[in-house]
A protein has these predicted regions:
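FabD-like malonyl-/acyl-CoA
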Residues: 2-140, 270-299
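Cys-dependent protein tyrosine phosphatase-like superfamily
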Residues: 2-5, 221-229, 235, 241-252, ...
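Short, flexible helix/strand-to-coil boundary loops that buttress conserved ligand/catalytic motifs
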Residues: 48, 144, 179, 284, ...
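Glycine-rich phosphate/pyrophosphate-binding beta-alpha loops
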Residues: 61-63, 198, 253
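Non-catalytic positions within long, well-ordered alpha-helices that form the structural scaffold/packing
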Residues: 77, 183, 264-267
């Protein structure tokens, strides 16, 4: 028997109108988004469904993404479809925690609201992220280390997304130097990302420390569905470890490709991307084309999947 994975995307896939069909037609999905509003004091439906300038600002993006992911997840499990294992990219790890049973939706919403604020506050001026396409990971790591040492500044790998796509992060000048070196070393392209800061770098450690304080009062429950953390690309065995990984995750590399490869090695053969956009499905095509990938963003996707 194969295994079904529920996987949850990170920020960057948000769009106005995300989740609206579920909110309008499914009472339980609506209740989840309304719970997010209650837990945060924000009008989540207005942020998600109405034209506004806030949805792309980190402190709002994160909670809105998680609310929609959790609402779609609720709609799926209401149909009796459950995961055998779960994972999420960066912010999406909180969706995975909900699906694993380790964190309640209410707690996840409250924590992620704070996470978004802390990450927004911690964003220093002069940070940047760049996607490096078509270069060996070890070469990129070596270039980042050499650049960091020579310039006495921060630059490192933020995301191992899929073969041929790695994101580097850090101080803008150092990221630019490293990107130029990657191009010289044979990278097909280096694409600066439109982000508000150097996420998943040492420059975000302050946000991680604040997050650790916020997590102190949160109860972590038994892990009922196995889940893999970005930090190690391995299963989290003990509830006691969850908070440490969530704290580290803010300033650590996201090992997404390694996570997916581990899941496939362990027998996973159906991957269900739950939430806005199709970024994870795109990565899957480059990691392994032989496994089944399902994208559930719109109501049409949902109905096709549950009625298959």
């Amino acid at each position: 028997m194969g295994k079904r994975v529920f996987m949850f995307p990170g920020q960057g896939s948000q769009y106005i109108g995300m989740g609206k069909e579920f909110y309008d037609t499914m009472p339980n999905a609506k209740a989840v988004i309304d719970l997010a509003s209650e837990q945060t004091g924000l009008d989540i439906p207005a942020l998600c469904f109405e034209e506004n300038d806030k949805l792309n600002i980190t402190e709002y993006t994160q909670i809105c993404m998680l609310a929609v992911e959790a609402a779609i997840y609720q709609a799926i499990i209401d149909k009796g479809i459950t995961p055998d294992v779960t994972a999420g990219l960066s912010l999406g790890e909180y969706g995975a925690l909900i699906a694993s049973g380790a964190m309640t939706m209410a707690d996840a919403f409250a924590v992620v609201r704070k996470r978004g604020i802390y990450m927004q506050e911690a964003v220093p001026t002069g940070g940047a992220m760049t996607a490096v396409l078509g270069l060996d990971p070890q070469v990129i790591e070596d270039i980042c280390k050499k650049t960091a040492d020579e310039t006495n500044s921060v630059v490192s790998v933020a995301n191992y997304n899929c073969p041929g796509q790695i994101v580097i992060t850090g101080e803008k000048a150092a990221v630019d130097v490293a990107a130029a070196a990657c191009s010289e070393a044979g990278a097909k392209r280096c694409v600066p990302l439109k982000v508000s800061g150097p996420f998943h770098s040492a420059m975000l450690k302050g946000a991680g420390e604040k997050l650790a304080d916020a997590l102190e009062s949160v109860e972590i429950h038994d892990i009922k569905v196995p889940y893999i953390t970005n930090v190690t690309a391995d299963y989290v065995k003990s509830p006691a470890d969850v908070k440490d990984y969530l704290t580290q995750q803010v300033s650590s590399s996201v090992r997404w490709q390694q996570t997916i490869e581990r899941l496939i090695a362990d027998g996973a053969d159906e991957f269900v991307e739950i939430g806005p956009g199709r970024s994870l499905s795109g990565f899957m095509r480059k990691i392994n084309r032989d496994v089944k990938v399902v994208k559930i963003d719109k109501l049409e996707d949902f109905e096709k999947y549950v009625n298959r």
